[in-house]
Amino acid sequence: MDSNKDERAYAQWVIIILHNVGSSPFKIANLGLSWGKLYADGNKDKEVYPSDYNGKTVGPDEKIQINSCGRENASSGTEGSFDIVDPNDGNKTIRHFYWECPWGSKRNTWTPSGSNTKWMVEWSGQNLDSGALGTITVDVLRKGN
């Protein structure tokens, strides 16, 4: 990495680990960014795109990791959202997730919304104070069969 790069935007980041802890698959849908970029695991300089995630199925005991940060040399952080949907129930939304990790702000946002009573979804790890939003783990489980 070029030592002359402005790393401040890279300091605004989030890693979201979606873990299927149940026996039914779910899919990622509608992933989009308002600010920042998505990047490959462990490499903020290797940009990836929403199309790399949208439509991906996460099977039983599988994990998928979504990484996002601000763009280098830009005074912006990262902001985006995505849905997880049930492919066995007409792609009905399980939950909607929104994040914002703004550059130069004292507050971060992590907002899961929506409800699907067939699924249990729990999350932990979000840092709502200034700096990086951090690593958020989301456990997803379809109840029953």
UniProtKB/Swiss-Prot annotation:
UniProt keywords, alphabetically: Cytolysis, Hemolysis
Family to which this protein belongs: Belongs to the aegerolysin family.
Gene name per UniProt: AA-PRI1
Residues cleaved off as propeptide: 1-8
Gene3D superfamilies in the record: 2.60.270.50
Record-given protein name: Aegerolysin Aa-Pri1
GO biological process: symbiont-mediated hemolysis of host erythrocyte
Pfam family, one: Aegerolysin
Keyword check for Cell membrane: no
Domain of life: Eukaryota
